[in-house]
Design a protein with these regions (language model features):
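Conserved P-loop/Walker A NTP-binding site and adjacent catalytic elements of P-loop NTPases
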Residues: 1-63
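Short, hinge-like loop/turn segments at secondary-structure boundaries
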Residues: 1-4, 82-86
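Glycine-rich, flexible loop/turn motifs
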Residues: 12, 79, 88
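Structural recognition of the conserved hydrophobic beta-strand(s) that form the central parallel beta-sheet
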Residues: 32-34, 63-70, 99, 106
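Conserved protein kinase catalytic core
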Residues: 41-42, 75, 113
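An amphipathic, basic-hydrophobic helix/alpha-beta surface used to engage anionic
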Residues: 44-45, 61-64, 70, 104, ...
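Signature of the SF2 helicase/ATPase Hel1-core->accessory helical subdomain module
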Residues: 49-50, 55-85, 110
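C-terminal accessory "lid"/substrate-recognition subdomains
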Residues: 91-98, 102-149
């Protein structure tokens, strides 16, 4: 499977690697896979949010498969905050989700996800430790899973 080169930039002394929208538009594949629909782009990117990149791809006639976690959907935000005690800031408008032509639920047992986090398969070790101590607890993941179902 072909991978497009990322857009690499410096921001506040940190090297950031972002989805390269212009490369995707130039390549113009029939279908593209773009991770993390709710992601906030680096300042160097044309759009503030990744879902806006995806809207541009769709408007250019490119089909897109993407990923999103249930806690990133705007209308669910208050429920997620009341369950987890954490306000999720990376969110998409409901209309973006509602306009999807197809949605497929991909599920994993909460404990299995925690094990993947701890093994470094999702985030860096430091990020994973913070995540499992705060947001990604068995209780929170179980509640989010119930919301998704």
């Amino acid at each position: 499977m072909e991978c497009l080169p990322n857009l690499v930039s410096e921001y506040n002394g940190i090297t950031l690697s972002e989805f390269n929208l212009d490369a995707a538009l130039a390549r113009h594949p029939q279908l593209i896979l773009v991770d993390e629909l709710a992601h906030t782009n680096a300042p160097v990117c044309r759009h503030t949010k990744r879902y806006q990149d995806i809207e541009e791809l769709l408007n250019a006639g490119i089909d897109v498969y993407t990923t999103i976690n249930v806690q990133h959907i705007e209308s669910i935000n208050d429920t997620v905050a009341s369950i987890t005690g954490i306000m999720v800031h990376e969110r998409i408008p409901d209309s973006v989700f509602d306009n999807a032509s197809q949605v497929e639920l991909v599920d994993i047992e909460p404990q299995e996800l925690i094990e993947r986090l701890q093994a470094g398969k999702v985030y860096s070790p430091t990020q994973a430790e913070r995540a499992t101590e705060n947001f990604f607890t068995v209780e929170n993941l179980t509640a989010l899973r119930e919301i998704a179902l």
